[in-house]
Curated annotation (Swiss-Prot):
Stated family: Belongs to the uroplakin-3 family.
Gene: UPK3B
The protein's name in its UniProt record: Uroplakin-3b
InterPro entries: Uroplakin-3 (IPR024831)
Annotated CDD domains: UP_IIIb
Primary localization class, coarse: membrane
Species assigned in the record: Bos taurus (Bovine)
Annotated signal sequence range: 1-26
UniProt topology in membrane: Single-pass type I membrane protein
Length: 279
């Protein structure tokens, strides 16, 4: 007779237990999607790193001074099965990426993410550079939450997770879109056939080739003029020797044979006759 009266109480207790909010399941989903920074920067995405915009003014309403903002990095196929850690000991470090496909890094306090204009005149872009700590690979005793370079092109997905001082999650953002890193090409895979080039590229190449030919011709002409003096040296003007006589130009006069025959013996043209000293 007493059993039917206890059964409704058991059902009521079960409903209360199931309906009681669990701390691990009451996460606030923040309508924010992490993305690559929109700042005009070189190398926003490289072969081992990528730069995210900082989540400023995103987690302020859900956090306290003792909370920590974590970045969760996962392969795209592992992001669907990622389970938020419940304690600090369960937070996965960077080596777990190669085994479990995800890890957490870049712990930040709310003081490091001020809600203000990022263009503060310091000249530094407010970004979070994932995979920027190259020293992690060389340090055998690397920090637990080291920001090591990413091992492959991905693709990756990231999200921000807010935890309290005990490591219990409080809020999280959406997962980002796919982030693929850059990949280098082997020299043999690069097609150098001119037919693959665009028309503008062919015109520019032709103009540069013509200019190079003109410069070469100008160089050869200048070189030939410069070294011609070495091949054919100029003749130096004849120098006068010491003791040489330099006088006015003398014009000779032609004397007809008839006049030369009438001159007395012993006389020459233009000379007076001298008396003979012979007896």
């Amino acid at each position: 007779m007493g059993l039917p009266s206890r059964q409704p109480r058991l059902w009521l207790l079960l409903l209360v237990v199931l309906g009681w909010p669990q701390p691990c399941l009451t996460l606030d989903l923040i309508p924010y999607t992490p993305r690559i920074t929109s700042w005009d920067l070189e190398g926003k995405v490289t072969a081992t790193t990528f730069s995210l915009e900082q989540p400023r003014c995103v987690l302020d309403r859900h956090s306290s001074a003792a909370d920590t903002v974590w970045l969760v990095v996962a392969f795209s196929n592992a992001s669907r099965v990622f389970q938020n850690p419940q304690t600090l000991a369960e937070i996965p470090a960077s080596p777990r990426l190669l085994t479990d496909g995800h890890y957490m890094t870049l712990p930040l306090t709310m003081d490091q993410l001020p809600c203000e204009d990022p263009a503060d005149g310091s000249g530094r872009a407010p970004v979070l550079r994932v995979g920027n700590d190259a020293g992690c690979l060389a340090d055998l005793h690397q920090p637990r939450y080291c920001n090591a370079p990413l091992p492959g092109p991905g693709p990756y997905r990231v999200k921000f997770l807010l935890t309290n001082s005990r490591g219990s999650p409080q809020a999280e953002t959406r997962w980002s879109d796919l982030i693929a890193l850059r990949q280098g090409k082997s020299p043999g895979s690069i097609d150098t056939w001119p037919g693959r080039r665009s028309g503008d590229m062919i015109i520019i190449t032709s103009i540069l080739s013509s200019l190079a030919g003109l410069l070469l011709l100008a160089f050869l002409a200048a070189s030939s003029v410069r070294f011609s003096s070495l091949w054919w040296p100029e003749e130096a003007p004849e120098q006068l020797r010491i003791g040489s006589f330099m006088g006015k130009r003398y014009m000779t006069h032609h004397i007809p044979p008839s006049e030369a025959a009438t001159l007395p013996v012993g006389c020459e043209p233009g000379l007076e006759r001298f008396p003979s000293l012979s007896p």
